[in-house]
Regions:
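Short beta->alpha connector loops at strand-helix junctions that form conserved
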Residues: 41, 450-452, 471-474, 562, ...
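Flexible inter-domain linker/hinge segments
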Residues: 210, 379-411, 525-531, 535-542, ...
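Conserved alpha/beta-domain cores
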Residues: 95, 519, 529-877
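Hydrophobic beta-strand scaffold residues
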Residues: 38-39, 469, 830
Length: 877
């Protein structure tokens, strides 16, 4: 028997998400909860059919086609309508639905099944020709765009031209005759672009639409969204074929989107929007600015009462805030979909805490339901209140996604991306955004749209990304072609500064200063619960007391990486390090290093004080020496004068430091082997600082000295001997009983492979996954960006291995080294200090392999704390 690729809504349930996708599983579950009379019925083509489509060379095979045709017949029996029948036609929508919600990422087709014959009969039988022709022109436009990839703009231009000729401003003001003319113009446009007639056979239309949904799983914007949200390519998408409910039959019809709680603030109140005489995509696409959901009560009282009752039932059933789409057809309510709603980080925390307080979920469930990556947005700036009070808004629209943003105006996603890459802060200003704009939206500080509401594409995507967004500013007079707009009498051109307040919807001229965000009470509650359930410690990467203090405020339990070279770049210090580099003898080098020692000691004391007894891992000098030498002629001359050498001699020294591959050159422990006096100086500074701060604070400090880039145990043994002899001497001279540890970074594959040998010398390992990734893959982090996009396009890599740990290769080395290290030294401390320490999927991996801690940048500490708790909760299920 062949595999089952198609399921009626009545055959599925919420547990079948992997097979039916999120939308399909929820439609099946919703059918069970609220009944088939409220949920327009249909069937779901599974994610396995999508995978099969790609395996068969992007073709729907005969078996899957036969099952689809069989289920069309079943759908006809359920609805009493017939596909392609002009007397009683079955019209359907075709939508994608992956396992994870991907709003706006994939394409929807409405009114499929229409052709000229069916439309004429519908127009006559319904007595509503305007509705019939509106459905048809929409279908031609969507099918042409989504299935045949004829750009939307050609059709929009024809609509705008027609409105201009008729002297109207809204699509709804066009008559049945106008829409009939448009439909024929659309078909002519289709033929001109494609070279064949628009398909009239509904089964041909349906297969084309299903293929388009499968194909859209691999479109560029879907690939970008998947990479950003950890959604594997292998999952595929399901396709939902659902009988149509019509919100565009007249003024007793409408369509809307609603949330059971406010997705921007988390407040417990129904929030949403609807449009009368419209179809589903109109609300989300932002073509007309809709009415608040409360006004639906006056228009459709019975449907509104039923809707609020269903909202309550759905939220109680799913135990989470729901995002629902609905249609009212001749005063009767139809529910088209429900899903857990996208929300801002602040709303996510409030909703989670409120659901715990309402007895709906447990603390563990609250911790598990928050996306750790979204916490980042809470820690980002808001407008300075004083400056904000003094500023007068030049416009106001809908506060679609909170936060403060100021930057230069740009008008296209391409410009936003290009300017952003140069380090410019930009505000993307659009009539409305579409999924094609996703990369520009990512690059922008804020987004401002002329059309669209709180549930438009711009609003939903911006909230998901944590980007400030103000939508539906109809006061703007936009001239996209010439890249300018007029607001409150002022013309703004590309490059002019504006500021947006995503919490109020206010728009300001110029730049308003921002201040650091303050964190609310819900953040503290969620973090306290996270700390209760996690076993993995979280440290920070910090080189300055300010970073260390910030990280402690955000819950860091120590410093996992202090890069000492970052302390060498201040004017007085760089002079001393350059003197050391230019020295000819050990004595000269020691003299130069003696100038650096008290400065380093002071730095370490400040870090120890900030950390109040928590562990501090200090990495000894790592980068190659050429990074410290001057490149400008005037600086070279200055160095020659201070060193009593000629410019030529200095240039010769600089030239001698040149390496063909500095990443694998004279750096890390190799510097300490060549110049042990550097390691000795840094050891003295570390130990003296620890002794002083231990006395001052009355706390026990155990310095952790980390030797970088070890690949051979004998290297470590050599440098460790220098460190221990120096440290023991300083401790003895001070009459102290200070204890210290010497460990190493595991960042060379050979170190991972011989970790049992290295653990005999090292009291702790810290995995430097940035270098370990470079050396395992054999490509440079600084150059990989030039070719990684091609690798993503060709499905060689799904993610940037420098952003998410490569669990199959690099991860195997980490796991092996951890096991080997523990076999030789059971109490060895294991950490990770690469950028991966703040990535949730990498944190989960670190939990699984039994590391002691992860270390990440200060602002990512809360992300790591929450991700560690989620990993632990998942592990104990």
């Amino acid at each position: 028997m062949s595999k089952k690729y198609v399921y009626l809504f009545s055959e599925g349930n919420a547990t079948m998400r992997e097979l039916l996708g999120g939308k399909g599983a929820n439609l099946a579950e919703m059918t069970k909860i609220i009944g088939a009379d409220v949920v327009p019925q249909g069937f779901t083509i599974t994610t396995e059919a999508c995978t099969q489509y790609y395996e068969d060379g992007r073709r729907i095979n005969d078996d899957i086609q036969a099952q689809i045709n069989e289920y069309i017949v079943k759908m006809e029996e359920i609805t009493g309508k017939k596909f392609g029948d002009k007397e009683n036609p079955l019209l359907v929508s075709v939508r994608s639905g992956a396992r994870a919600s991907m709003p706006g990422m994939m394409d929807t087709i409405l009114n499929l099944g229409l052709n000229e014959e069916v439309v004429n009969t519908m127009a006559a039988k319904s007595g509503n020709p305007r509705w019939a022709w509106d459905c048809y022109r929409r279908f031609i436009q969507m099918y042409s765009d989504v299935v045949m990839e004829v750009g939307k703009k050609y059709f929009e231009e024809l609509i705008d031209k027609m409105k201009e000729e008729k002297g109207v401003t809204q699509d709804v003001e066009l008559t049945a005759d106008d829409l009939k003319v448009l439909a024929n113009q659309f078909k002519a446009e289709y033929k001109a672009k494609i070279g064949e007639e628009f398909p009239s056979d509904p089964k041909v239309q349906l297969m084309g639409a299903i293929q388009a949904v499968f194909r859209s799983w691999d479109n560029p914007r879907a690939n970008v969204y998947r990479r950003d949200n950890d959604i594997p390519y292998s999952w595929g998408t399901a396709v939902n074929v659902q009988s149509m409910a019509f919100g565009n039959m007249g003024d007793d019809c409408g369509t809307g989107v609603a949330f059971t709680r406010d997705p921007a603030t988390g407040e417990k109140k129904l929030m949403g929007e609807f449009l009368t005489n419209a179809q589903g995509e109109d609300v989300v696409a932002g073509v007309r600015t809709p009415m608040p959901i409360a006004q639906m009560k006056e228009k459709f009282p019975a449907a509104y009462d039923k809707f609020t009752e269903i909202c309550s039932r759905l939220e109680n059933h799913y135990r989470d805030m729901q995002d629902m789409e609905f249609t009212v057809e001749n005063q009767k309510l139809y529910m088209l979909q429900t899903r857990n709603g996208k929300r801002t980080a602040q709303a996510a925390l409030k909703i989670a805490c409120d659901l715990v307080d309402e007895g709906m979920i447990s603390e563990k469930e609250a911790v598990a339901m928050i996306d750790p990556r979204n916490l980042d947005t809470l820690l980002h700036p808001q407008f300075d209140q004083k400056a904000l009070k003094a500023a007068t808004p030049v416009g106001k629209a809908l506060p679609a996604s909170p936060g403060a943003a100021c930057g230069k105006v740009v008008f296209t996603a391409e410009d936003a991306k290009e300017w952003g890459a140069k380090g410019e802060k930009v505000i993307l200003v659009r009539l409305e955004t579409s999924p094609e704009d996703i990369e520009g939206m990512k690059a922008a500080q804020g987004i401002l749209t002329v059309r669209g509401g709180m549930t438009s594409h711009a609003a939903v995507v911006a909230r998901g990304m944590g980007t400030c967004c103000v939508s539906g500013c109809s006061e703007i007079n936009m001239d996209e072609e010439n890249k300018k707009f007029v607001l409150s009498g002022k013309t703004y051109v590309e490059g002019d500064y504006i500021s947006l307040d995503g919490s109020t919807g206010n728009i300001y001229d110029g730049v308003i200063p921002t201040v650091d965000a303050s964190i609310g009470g819900e953040f503290g509650r969620i973090m306290a619960w996270a700390d209760k359930y996690r076993t993995l410690k979280v440290r920070t990467n910090a080189d300055t007391p300010a970073d260390a203090i910030r990280a402690r405020e955000l819950g860091a339990e120590g410093i996992g990486l202090c890069r000492t070279e970052h302390m060498f770049f201040e004017a007085d210090r760089i002079a001393a390090i350059r003197e050391m580099i230019c020295s000819d003898t050990v004595e000269q080098r020691e003299k130069a290093l003696a100038k650096l020692e008290p400065m380093q000691q002071g730095d370490f004391e400040a870090l120890y004080e900030a950390m109040e007894g928590y562990g501090v891992t200090i990495r000894f000098l790592d980068p190659p020496l050429h990074e410290f030498v001057p490149t400008e002629e005037k600086d070279i001359e200055l160095l020659a004068n201070t060193q009593g050498k000629t410019v030529e001699e200095i240039k010769a020294i600089i030239a001698s430091l040149h390496e063909f591959n500095p990443m694998m050159g004279h750096r890390g422990c190799r510097l300490a082997v060549t110049y042990p006096e550097i390691a000795a100086m840094q050891t003295r500074a570390v130990i003296k600082a620890a002794i002083n701060v231990s006395k001052k604070l009355g706390t026990k400090i155990v310095p952790e000295i980390m030797i970088p880039l070890v690949g051979e145990v004998k290297e470590l043994a050599y440098v460790k001997k220098v460190v221990c002899e120096t440290a023991d001497k300083v401790i003895a001279e001070a009459g102290s009983d200070l204890k210290y540890q010497v460990g190493t970074m595991i960042e060379i594959p050979r170190a991972a492979l011989t970790a049992d040998e290295i653990a005999k010398e090292a009291e702790f390992f810290s995995f430097g996954t940035n270098d370990l990734t470079q050396m395992t893959f054999g490509f440079s982090r600084d150059d990989a960006g030039k070719f990684l996009d091609a690798y993503y396009d060709r499905k060689i890599y799904e993610n940037d291995p420098f952003a998410k740990i490569d669990q199959i290769g690099v991860g195997k080395l980490v796991k092996m080294a951890a096991e080997l290290g523990r076999s030789a030294r059971p109490d060895i401390k294991l950490g990770i200090c690469g950028e991966h320490g703040g990535d949730p999927s990498s944190v989960e991996f670190c939990h699984k392999v039994g590391l002691t801690y992860v270390s990440c940048s200060p602002f990512r500490v809360p992300i790591a704390r929450l991700a560690a708790a989620q990993a632990s909760i998942k592990d104990n299920k």
